[in-house]
Amino acid sequence: MSLSPPNNLEHIITSQTLKWVFVGGKGGVGKTTTSCSLGVLIANRNPQKKVLIISTDPAHNTSDAFDIKFGAEPKAVPGVPNLSVMEVDVKDAMKGMFDGVEQGTNQNGEFGLLSEITGMVGMFKSVPGIDEAIAFSKIINQAQQMNYDLVLFDTAPTGHTLRFLSLPSVLRDMLEKVIKLQELFGPMMSQFGGIIGTNINFNELKPKMEDMLKTSEQIVKDFTNPNLTTFIPVLIPEFLPLYETERLIQELMNLNMDVNSIIVNQILPVNDCCDYCKNKRSVQAKYLGQIDVLYSDFHLIKINMQTNEVRGVPALCAFSKNFEAKH
């Protein structure tokens, strides 16, 4: 019988190949505390590395976790010079991309072209998660240009940021439509922006989408390479978080994304004398047993409920000891 993996994240902390680490889970399970404390730990243990934490969760709790106000540009964390944090709004990243197309008027009677373009854009925007997918492409490009050695993502609740892996296939479909439109309407494409009252140059749409496709294909290649990327689910020992975590892990595996570590957070101590806590701990024990069986091949890190708020660099440093090997 094979031994279970160590109950720590040393393989991530000491990795010389990892470039991207995702931390995700149901809201309220402690994923932001996990991502921030892990970022502090990796930066402190690897002073030669430039580490960046990117929050893509609309709640942006990273500012609260560090007790520092962060924004859309990377900001260094005082006391941890090789760690920076930024908070990205995916809605801002998508803003204006297709503005005006669906609302375009048809004053010159170009019903055929208007219908084709509006239908194409409408279909493109209706793809679930397409805004996050394109925003991720922009975010990844930005992070790559900054030359960080490791990027940790504090993601939106369970699964929301995984849809970007479908972006290449969506873009390929859209490119086929753009090519078809150019073949059908030819020179009219360059005049269409004036017809519907928008500044979009549809002759530039094809090369832009080709560039986006090339970028997204490389991102997917990197994100499905276990030497470069891993995903860490965070949960608490209750039914819904466990159910959603199992669904998330199955989705990750179907997308060929590596997941080998799980954080089980907010565990109540066994010897708590409060009746409510005893009953709560009894429920937790049931799900902890299921977690042990389901994820015996994973690095399982179990963390007790914290008696104090985890806020600020010193508190994050203290919390991060849960991820290290015990000596």
UniProtKB/Swiss-Prot annotation:
Gene3D superfamilies: P-loop containing nucleotide triphosphate hydrolases. InterPro entries: Anion-transp_ATPase-like_dom (IPR025723), ATPase_ArsA/GET3 (IPR016300), ATPase_ArsA/GET3_euk (IPR027542), P-loop_NTPase (IPR027417). GO terms for molecular function: ATP binding; ATP hydrolysis activity; metal ion binding. Its EC number is 3.6.-.-. Keywords: ATP-binding, Cytoplasm, Endoplasmic reticulum, Hydrolase, Metal-binding, Nucleotide-binding, Transport, Zinc. HAMAP family: Asna1_Get3. NCBIfam families: GET3_arsA_TRC40. ATPase required for the post-translational delivery of tail-anchored (TA) proteins to the endoplasmic reticulum. Recognizes and selectively binds the transmembrane domain of TA proteins in the cytosol. This complex then targets to the endoplasmic reticulum by membrane-bound receptors, where the tail-anchored protein is released for insertion. This process is regulated by ATP binding and hydrolysis. ATP binding drives the homodimer towards the closed dimer state, facilitating recognition of newly synthesized TA membrane proteins. ATP hydrolysis is required for insertion. Homodimer. This is ATPase ASNA1 homolog. It comes from Entamoeba dispar (strain ATCC PRA-260 / SAW760).
